[in-house]
């Protein structure tokens, strides 16, 4: 499940980019995904990829164990080493 928030199931949004001359081309707005360790329903620690907005709610409800900002989250299926 690359580029998907694993809690809210949100995906990237698509649309058009418009210039001043009203030219258009297709583009996508990707999510701000962060890899984080959280507690699940059984109080086990699970590593998930969530958006920054979801992470804000998790921090508010004290569900976050650890956020690893030192390494970017792996994006599978895109420019992966062979």
UniProtKB/Swiss-Prot annotation:
Entry keyword set: Ribonucleoprotein, Ribosomal protein
A GO CC term assigned to this protein in UniProt: ribonucleoprotein complex
Domain of life, per lineage: Bacteria
Coiled-coil regions, chain positions: none
Annotated segments matching region Disordered: 1-25
GO BP annotations, alphabetical order: translation
UniProt key word DNA repair: no
A molecular-function term among this protein's GO annotations: structural constituent of ribosome
Cited NCBIfam families: L28
HAMAP family: Ribosomal_bL28
Family to which the UniProt record says this protein belongs: Belongs to the bacterial ribosomal protein bL28 family.
Record protein name field: Large ribosomal subunit protein bL28
């Amino acid at each position: 499940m690359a580029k998907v928030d694993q809690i809210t199931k949100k995906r990237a949004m698509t649309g058009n980019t418009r210039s001043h001359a009203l030219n258009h081309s297709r583009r996508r707005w990707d999510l701000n995904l962060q890899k984080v360790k959280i507690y699940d329903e059984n109080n086990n620690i699970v590593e998930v990829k969530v958006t920054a907005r979801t992470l804000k709610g998790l921090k508010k409800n004290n569900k976050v164990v650890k956020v690893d900002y030192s390494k970017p989250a792996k994006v599978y299926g895109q420019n992966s080493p062979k």
